Every structure is written in C-alpha cells, then in structure tokens.
Amino acid sequence: MGSILMATIKEVKEQLAILRDLDDPRWASFEEDSRTGVQAAIRKRRKAILAELAEEERLEILLNYEKSLYARGIELIAGVDEVGRGPLAGPVVAAAVILPKLCKIKGLNDSKKIPKSKHEAIYNQVMKEAVAVGIGIKDNYVIDDVNIYEATKLAMIEAIEKLNPQPEHLLIDAMNLDLPIEQTSIIKGDANSLSIAAASIVAKVTRDKMMADYEQEFPGYAFAKNAGYGTKEHLSGIDKFGVTPIHRRSFEPIKSIIKK
C-alpha cells in the first residue's frame, strides 16, 4: 500500500489500466489515495471497465443465432446484408461474411449505428478476422431492368457464391433467397446477428468507396457525402447538371425528370 501512495499519478494510471475486474481487491489500496488526480483516474477506469463489460454482453447477445447453430454442429455460417436500396444513384451492394466460431469484434454493429469515423477500422478488422468474404454488386442498369428488390437478391446471391469455403447456413437480413443452402431470415438482422452486422459494414464501406469514386467522375452531386441518396444537395446537382449514367431511371424523381 505504501508503494501505491508514493507512486506518481501517471504510475497509478498505469497500474489501474491492468485491472479488469470491479471486484479486484487491489481497488481498495488505490482508493486510500486521496489525491484528486488519482480519484479521477479511478472513476475513469471503473467507467471504462463497465463499458467493456457492457460491450462484451452486447456481443454475446449478437451471437445468439450463431450459437444456436453451433449447438447443431453448424460452423460455416454466413451473414448476408445489403446497402443501397434507397439511393437515386449508384449500385446496390451486398456482402456475405463467414466469421470464425464465437468471433467477437469490438464495436461491430449495424453499420447505421457505427460512427462513420470508425467504419474503416471495423471494416479492416472484419476483413482480417473473417474466414471468407464475398461481395455482390448490381448497378443501376440491373436495378432499372429487374427492380430494386430483385437486384438486391441477385447481389446477395453473387456475394454468397463468391464465398470460399461455401457456407452451411445463411443468416440473412429480412430476405429469403432461392439457394440450396439452409437459411434464416432475420428482421433487423444487422442489429441482431454479429455475422449480419459484419456483412453490413463490409457492404457499407465498399459502396461508400464506390460513391466517392463516382464523385470524382461526376462532380457536382456530392456523391461522396450523400452516397447517392436524394439529399437537397444531390437534387440541386441534378437541377444544375442533369441526370448521370449512374442514376436509377426507374426511381422518382429521376423517372419524371427524364420524361420532360
């Protein structure tokens, strides 16, 4: 205890960082140090541990579907999701991801709930950890030809067919696919399955990069910012510069604009 009281605040912080359990008896020694800096460090570390425990619990819950399949001896489970159904421009992108058994990637969630600043890091972690990743892309011409729902299915099937090894079971975000693979359709799957969440972030980052490239090719529509969605800035670009080759002509207001 004497050595703790004699330690600098920096040294105390380093020792606190080692603690992982709120019931660790070493907390008592630190709490006897009345220095304001030490007490602040204790509160900060306790808060961090609580956040870590909450994240661990969240990830465990996200593995519920996967764990029920593991219990049946099924290990090659692919999460499948898409991004880009609603935009006025650009492709629909689907991803299929097989994660290792009981894999946990901190911060992984429905891509819409992940801060944009963290997208790239979590995407990189998924790509590093995954057993297999497949990506399917259907452009605006396919979307206009078969409709967005069917194009989404085609993108998902393409993503799954690119997986090596092939999955034994599919966990899909609110979709049923005509494939000879056992599958489970999950409403709001990207918020309820870790495998689907992994597919969600892969599809999101892949599509965002494509839209950023399209901004270079078609400036004036802010594609890197709006990802092709019908924002005020995007619609203003259409008014000024017209419809581009990547706009979906079966979507309003594009459909009405090209009829004028």
UniProtKB/Swiss-Prot annotation:
Keywords per UniProt: Cytoplasm, Endonuclease, Hydrolase, Manganese, Metal-binding, Nuclease
EC number: 3.1.26.4
GO CC annotations on file: cytoplasm; ribonuclease H2 complex
Co-factor binding details: Manganese or magnesium. Binds 1 divalent metal ion per monomer in the absence of substrate. May bind a second metal ion after substrate binding.
Reactions it catalyzes: Endonucleolytic cleavage to 5'-phosphomonoester
Regions annotated as coiled coil: none
Subcellular location, record wording: Cytoplasm
HAMAP family to which the protein is assigned, alphabetical: RNase_HII_B
UniProt-annotated binding residues for a divalent metal cation: D81, E82, D173
Protein name per Swiss-Prot or TrEMBL: Ribonuclease HII
Pfam families: RNase_HII
Cofactor: Mn(2+); Mg(2+)
Stated family: Belongs to the RNase HII family.
Superkingdom as given in the UniProt entry: Bacteria
Keyword Cytoplasm: yes
Keyword Iron-sulfur included in the entry's annotation: no
Domain RNase H type-2: 75-260
Origin species: Streptococcus thermophilus (strain ATCC BAA-250 / LMG 18311)
